[in-house]
Swiss-Prot record:
Catalyzed reactions per annotation: a quinone + NADH + 5 H(+)(in) = a quinol + NAD(+) + 4 H(+)(out)
Lineage, highest ranks first: Bacteria, Pseudomonadati, Pseudomonadota, Alphaproteobacteria, Magnetococcales
Subunit structure: NDH-1 is composed of 14 different subunits. Subunits NuoB, C, D, E, F, and G constitute the peripheral sector of the complex.
Primary gene name: nuoD
NCBIfam families, per database record: NuoD (TIGR01962), PRK06075.1 (NF004739)
Organism in which the protein naturally occurs: Magnetococcus marinus (strain ATCC BAA-1437 / JCM 17883 / MC-1)
Keywords: Cell inner membrane, Cell membrane, Membrane, NAD, Quinone, Translocase, Transport, Ubiquinone
Name of the protein in question: NADH-quinone oxidoreductase subunit D
Disulphide bridges: none
Matches recorded under PANTHER family: NADH DEHYDROGENASE [UBIQUINONE] IRON-SULFUR PROTEIN 2, MITOCHONDRIAL, NADH-UBIQUINONE OXIDOREDUCTASE 49 KDA SUBUNIT
Length: 397
């Protein structure tokens, strides 16, 4: 007698690997998915494939040499990563930053936010099937990369923020280029919203997908757009202002439902608020020095090194030995595009950190995938991962 389906008493779920070689994995993410048909029962993230030992490397480098390693953490938010490191060094060494340098750092922190969020819109749209967003966003992103390059000579690994200020002043004409971009960027955001915000397919793919309540967001340690998307109006730029953020006015956009759609809307509004911040900084910024005048800490100006022996000696000492910080410990955090990036820095009084601990926002967000994905279809996993906006440089470190 042929067997029938009723003869089998047990049906088992099956497991599949999502990534690490997958275009929607946003890096080297490996998810072990347990499926009941097409419904996700469990999603276990496996991390560590991009581990480079950054925290240990920082113990072997001077405080100046440590800055480029932060460019390579979240390599889509380069100057924001540097920001946390230099602020930690400045607080531990009680190093003062000139006012103009504070404004420049604030401007470039917001430009970095644009660069990151534009990539988020582009990649998230591509994950869901909206390829036009990819083309539109890279049009504006290219302008911003040129603005990056004009200030520091690099499009990605900037090494522009330094303890005590920035590497060099803005070249002639760059302030006007930034103003021009801020004048037309809101109309481009309107174009993005025309394409996506009320798009029926976009809303079907994002609304009620990956919902996170306020309580769960706090429990998982969410920060940045992930926390604000769940309705919590917390932003380090307001709560613990640094550089010029206490001198500018801006609002904190928050979501209502805590789903992928709200996280998208929060990032759109963050771009609009970033335009306001940059415009206020440009209006308030005055000519002046852009780095601390103690050349035992800050690099002397290149034109001085060509004429002054003392400046050349300072440069040689900083490049070979760096500078010493007093013994102690400090925690500094900044509001990067992905959330709170924190640096816990311990000094034993030498020219290198005794210990440097990095708190990456994306690590906490990735932990929650197993809860966010449970009960959703397998096609929704790419939406959830995209809405988190993860980069494995900072997660694996």
């Amino acid at each position: 007698m042929p067997a029938t389906i009723t003869d089998h008493k047990e049906f088992q779920n099956y497991a599949i690997n999502f990534g690490p070689q997958h275009p929607a994995a946003h890096g080297v993410l490996r998810l072990l998915l347990e499926l009941d048909g097409e419904v996700v029962e469990r999603a276990d993230p496996h991390v560590g494939l991009l581990h480079r030992g950054t925290e240990k490397l920082l113990e072997q480098k001077t405080y100046i040499q440590g800055t480029p390693y932060f460019d390579r953490l979240d390599y889509m938010s380069m100057m924001s990563e540097e920001h946390a490191w230099v602020i930690a060094v400045e607080r531990l060494g009680q190093i003062e930053v000139p006012e103009r340098a504070q404004y420049i750092r604030t401007i470039y922190a917001e430009i970095t936010r644009f660069i990151n969020h534009l990539l988020f819109f582009a990649a998230h749209g591509l994950d869901v099937g909206a390829m036009t967003m990819f083309l539109y966003c890279f049009r504006e992103r290219e302008e911003l990369m040129d603005i990056y390059e004009a200030a520091c000579g690099a499009r990605m690994h900037a090494n522009y923020f330094r303890p005590g200020g920035v590497a060099r002043d803005l070249p002639d004409g760059l302030e006007q280029r930034i103003r021009d971009f801020c004048n037309h960027f809101p109309s481009k955001l309107d174009e993005y919203e025309t394409l996506l915000t009320n798009n029926r397919i976009w809303k079907q793919r994002l609304v009620d997908i990956g919902k996170v309540s306020q309580e769960d967001a706090f429990s998982w340690g969410f920060t940045g757009p992930m926390l604000r998307g769940s309705g919590v109006a917390f932003d380090l730029r307001k709560a613990e202002p640094y550089d010029a953020y206490d001198r500018v006015e801006f609002d904190i956009p928050v979501g209502k439902n805590g789903d992928s759609y709200d996280r998208y809307l929060v990032r759109i509004e963050e771009c609009r608020e970033g335009v306001k911040i940059i415009q206020q900084c440009l209006d308030q910024m005055q000519p002046g020095p852009v780095r601390n005048d103690n050349f035992k800490i800050s690099m002397p100006y290149r034109q001085d090194m060509q004429q002054d022996m003392e400046s050349m000696i300072h440069h040689f000492k900083l490049c070979t030995e760096g500078f010493n910080l007093p013994a102690g410990e400090v925690y500094a955090a900044v509001e990067t595009p992905k959330g709170e990036l924190g640096v816990y820095l311990v000094s034993d009084g030498g020219n290198k950190p005794y210990r440097a601990r990095i708190r990456a926002a994306g690590f906490n967000h990735l932990q929650a995938v197993k809860e966010m994905a449970r009960g959703h279809m397998i096609a929704d996993v790419t939406t959830i991962i995209g809405s988190i906006d993860i980069v494995f440089g900072e997660i694996d470190r």
